[in-house]
Amino acid sequence: MIAKIAPDSRLRIDPAALGLEAAARSFFRRDTVAVARDLIGAWFARRYRGYWHGGRIVETEAYLGPGDAAAHSWKGRRTPRVEPMYGDGGLLYVFFVYGMHHCANIVTRKPGDPQAVLLRAAEGPEGSPARLMSGPARLCAALGVTKLASGLDLVGSGRYRIFLSSGARPLIAVSPRIGVDYAGDAAGWPLRFFDRESRAVSGRASGKRRAGPAS
């Protein structure tokens, strides 16, 4: 499933009409786990031909850098592909897997501290299919996100943005991350967060129910 250049037209949104505000740099420079939790309910959007297209994030996973065996920056690994993780909080890190899928991550913390949050699933605006962006590959395919976007800044006037909502916070559940059995003890760390009530969540691994943002 190769991501298209154009986003799905059913994902067109008006951030102002939805009461959304663009996230500032300070949002992304915080603790990675807090960012991963607070991204639940936020919107990931791409501007294409003058219009925003996006989805409300309903599932994320935190990756904690050199000390996390599941992270691409495990033990300080630094390759051209991983380089965006070493940048400032608020950059996009997009990687290509299995020769067919793109996965989008939000870089956190400050430069030199390579941590990130994987966007696992989102739900589009009213009228779009419930599971159109269920899973990291589907999310990127629906929004036309490819590895060409890796390293782009989500803060400022660029074509990708995280928008925060002032509405009620969703009920958030927590579980170990999906597909990281190779990571030893890190495979069991509770670093996956998802909206309990969303049909777009990609997997239903058991999770502890919590409400509100991270403390």
Predicted regions and their residues:
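Conserved, well-structured core segments that form or line functional sites
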Residues: 2-215
